[in-house]
Amino acid sequence: MFDKILPYLLSGISVGGQYALIAVGYTMVYGILRLINFAHGDIFTAAGFFMVYIAATLPVQVAIPLVVVLTVILGFTVERAAYKPLRSAPRMSVMISAIGVSYLLQNLMWYVTGGLAKQYPTIPWISNSITIGPATTKVVTIVTPILTILLVIALVTIIQKTKIGMAMRAVSKDFETAPLMGIKIDSVISTTFIIGSLLAAVGSVLYFTNYTSVTPTVGAMPGLKAFVAAVFGGIGSIPGAVIGAFIIGICENLIKALGYTTFSDAFTFALLIVILLFKPTGLFGEKISEKV
């Protein structure tokens, strides 16, 4: 029985790490702006296409840092063009803008690619096979959770120990009062989007190493699952988002191991409904009171 489950368990831990890198972007933006960045999954997809086109002309080792830089620029541009002008607008307007950006990015990718799936390049070493007990998997399966944990530890350290991290925490606690304390709101928000986009780019490289085909809408499902992970863990809580992502990744793969592959996606969204019904703040989220 263990021999059968082990490959799915390893895959679940790996997928959970990939969801976690996306989920942190959702939860950081929500923590600062109280906004669900619906375009985040499309930025993740764009990172996949960046790699496809850049790796066609440059070595993969050069392409990866370029992909990260381009993805960060895209995330920064989205924030400046679509969200910054609406800083004082009603929250519904910002949410509609986020949905519009998502569809804009999807349609741009459809236009550029003609709607055709693109083959993701093979990345040396992490695409190699490795045997762990009775299971054979890719090196990326082992690298993903380790890299995810290291990146999250680095991020938490930045938030807790640095000046920009203190500013992020201040803005998250009280958006209106923070500017009166000399905090540059625009810089904090831009930094938040930059970090979220960077993590999405890393998650994209890890994700598409296993799922080698990139389409304009491929980021929708991992993006939604990462969002559910953020809600499950307590949106606004980075550790909560990471734990929620690993739980979802492991559970959906164990469901596949039991032979219920069709219901693996349904489990994630059933979990979302249960969380919203019984614990809307998630595992580690705090109840937020609106100021009148």
Model regions and ranges:
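Short, non-helical or kinked segments that cap or interrupt transmembrane helices
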Residues: 17, 26-49, 88-93, 164-167, ...
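Alpha-helical transmembrane segments within multi-pass membrane transporters and channels
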Residues: 58-101, 108, 243-248, 279
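Transmembrane helix-bundle core of multi-pass membrane transporters
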Residues: 85-161, 188, 212, 254, ...
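Transmembrane alpha-helical segments in multi-pass inner-membrane proteins
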Residues: 19-21, 58-69, 190-200, 206-270
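Membrane-embedded helix boundary and interhelical linker motif in transport proteins
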Residues: 10, 32-77, 81, 86, ...
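Hydrophobic core segments of alpha-helical transmembrane domains in multi-pass membrane transport
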Residues: 51-53, 68-74, 101-109, 147-156, ...
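Helix-loop-helix "hairpin" substructures at the membrane interface of multi-pass membrane proteins
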Residues: 15-16, 136-214, 238-243
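Membrane-interfacial amphipathic/re-entrant helices at transmembrane-helix boundaries
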Residues: 1-21, 50, 61-62, 89-96, ...
